């Protein structure tokens, strides 16, 4: 595991502020938004569809804390772009939006460095103000929308209105206390992690923040490599994973196979009270990965010799299957959902940090074993040939 302290030069202009929103392209936006509200504690924020004059695409926007998810679907049978995306990838993340300052400058610099500009800067407005946008292409079919608010005071973005319906059940369910997007992870095919991470360093002036390789993260069967890139202020963190060759197909390779290439593997959501959050998410019916039971026995032994003290009761963490990772300065608590759709692609993470800025490297091996058990149930923990090809494919 390597942590990097060199951020490089501070960009003179064009600051990246934070994650603005994540857009999912799904088969049924209404149902997807409802699922995330009832299961995960989001609330309807905004809507765009036929009733608001949007004739091609319908979008339901949901929010929890500062986390904003947009679920979009095609309204017409001739929408080839969204239709093809759905067939290839299934329901999943299409766009990760960043709120920025000086969108024009960021686009100009990215263009000079060779980035593909999907859509040049444009402005949208309504009676509540103006917003400037631009869209860049990153890994796979994923895009980044840059969002520059020009004194905009609306609930979300121009063209969106208040949700047409508020589910009366939502107010009766326990609060989940998820506050902010901590990081968003992209999975790449083998040998594409470096080029995907370099894209951020070159085109967006991000820097390397953290990394692990397959000598540090591996089980008997499979392994991964990961690099985390971040903006100068480190308010946006983007881990990039790739599978490393092993005896069996790794969970990263399984993702790439079912997603039809690179894409967003998981979104980590931060909370200040993970015990209450997970209790309530479990009560709402969210399914989580369970690590082997030996994990907590080993954890108790290791913590006896650790320099830090975990404030939370380990018995409760074990009951809820929350994981702990630590160093000499602090610790983090984390847990991962099972896939959010039938394809074993996108899942979510809930994380709480106590003076610890890592990504749970100490848990990777236990998690990999948990992932492998799930893979085996799906019939996907298959042998790899010496050349890295899955046998029997």
From Swiss-Prot:
Compartments reported by the entry: Cytoplasm; Endoplasmic reticulum membrane; Golgi apparatus membrane
Disulfide bridge partners, by residue number: none
CDD domains associated with the record: HPPD_C_like (cd07250), HPPD_N_like (cd08342)
Gene Ontology CC, one term: Golgi membrane
Pathway: Amino-acid degradation; L-phenylalanine degradation; acetoacetate and fumarate from L-phenylalanine: step 3/6
Broad enzyme group: oxidoreductase
InterPro entries for this protein: 4OHPhenylPyrv_dOase (IPR005956), 4OHPhenylPyrv_dOase_C (IPR041735), 4OHPhenylPyrv_dOase_N (IPR041736), Glyas_Bleomycin-R_OHBP_Dase (IPR029068), Glyas_Fos-R_dOase_dom (IPR004360), VOC (IPR037523)
Reactions listed under catalytic activity: 3-(4-hydroxyphenyl)pyruvate + O2 = homogentisate + CO2
Membrane topology annotation: Peripheral membrane protein
Record text on cofactor binding: Binds 1 Fe cation per subunit.
Pfam families reported in the protein's UniProt record: Glyoxalase (PF00903)
Record-listed Phosphoserine modification sites: 211, 226, 250
N-acetylthreonine found at: 2
Names of required cofactors: Fe cation
Residues with the N6-succinyllysine modification: 132
Keywords: Acetylation, Cytoplasm, Dioxygenase, Endoplasmic reticulum, Golgi apparatus, Iron, Membrane, Metal-binding, Oxidoreductase, Phenylalanine catabolism, Phosphoprotein, Repeat, Tyrosine catabolism
Ranges where the VOC domain occurs: 18-149, 180-338
Residues that bind Fe cation: 183, 266, 349
Primary location class: cytoplasm
SUPFAM superfamilies: Glyoxalase/Bleomycin resistance protein/Dihydroxybiphenyl dioxygenase
One GO biological process term: tyrosine catabolic process
Similarity comment text for this entry: Belongs to the 4HPPD family.
Function: Catalyzes the conversion of 4-hydroxyphenylpyruvic acid to homogentisic acid, one of the steps in tyrosine catabolism.
Subunit field text: Homodimer.
Protein name: 4-hydroxyphenylpyruvate dioxygenase
Source organism of this protein record: Bos taurus
Chain's gene name: HPD
């Amino acid at each position: 595991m390597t942590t990097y302290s060199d951020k490089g030069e501070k960009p003179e202009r064009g600051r990246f502020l934070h994650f603005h929103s994540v857009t999912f392209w799904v088969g049924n936006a209404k149902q997807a938004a409802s699922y995330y509200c009832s299961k995960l504690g989001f609330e309807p924020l905004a809507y765009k569809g036929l009733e608001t004059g949007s004739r091609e695409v319908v979008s339901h926007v949901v929010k929890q804390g500062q986390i904003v998810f947009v679920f979009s679907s095609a309204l017409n049978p001739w929408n080839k772009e969204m239709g093809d995306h759905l067939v290839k990838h299934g329901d999943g993340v299409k766009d990760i939006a960043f709120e920025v300052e000086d969108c024009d400058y960021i686009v100009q610099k990215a263009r000079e460095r060779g980035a593909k500009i999907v859509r040049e800067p444009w402005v949208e407005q309504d009676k509540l103000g103006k917003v400037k946008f631009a869209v860049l292409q990153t890994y796979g079919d994923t895009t980044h929308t840059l969002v520059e608010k020009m004194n905009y005071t609306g609930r979300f973005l121009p063209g969106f209105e208040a949700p047409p319906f508020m589910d009366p059940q939502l107010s009766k369910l326990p609060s989940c206390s998820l506050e902010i997007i901590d990081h968003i992870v992209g999975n790449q095919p083998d040998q594409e992690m470096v080029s995907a991470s370099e894209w951020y360093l070159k085109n967006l002036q991000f820097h390397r923040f953290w990394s692990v390789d397959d000598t540090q993260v591996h089980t008997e069967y499979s392994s991964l490599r990961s690099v985390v890139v971040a903006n100068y202020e480190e308010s946006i963190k983007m881990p990039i994973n790739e599978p490393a060759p092993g005896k069996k197909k790794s969970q990263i390779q399984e993702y790439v196979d079912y997603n039809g290439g690179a894409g967003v593997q998981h979104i980590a959501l931060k909370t200040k009270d993970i015990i209450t959050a997970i209790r309530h998410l479990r009560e709402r019916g969210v399914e989580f990965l369970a690590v082997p039971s030996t994990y907590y026995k080993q954890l108790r032994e290791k913590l006896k010799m650790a320099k830090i003290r975990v404030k939370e009761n380990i018995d409760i963490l074990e009951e809820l299957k929350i994981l702990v990772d630590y160093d000499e300065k602090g610790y983090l608590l984390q847990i991962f959902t099972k896939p959010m759709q039938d394809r074993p692609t996108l899942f979510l993470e809930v994380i709480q940090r106590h003076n610890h800025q890592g990504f749970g490297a100490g848990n990777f091996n236990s998690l990999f074993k948990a992932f492998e058990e799930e893979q085996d149930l799906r019939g996907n923990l298959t042998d790899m040939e010496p050349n890295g090809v899955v046998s029997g494919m």
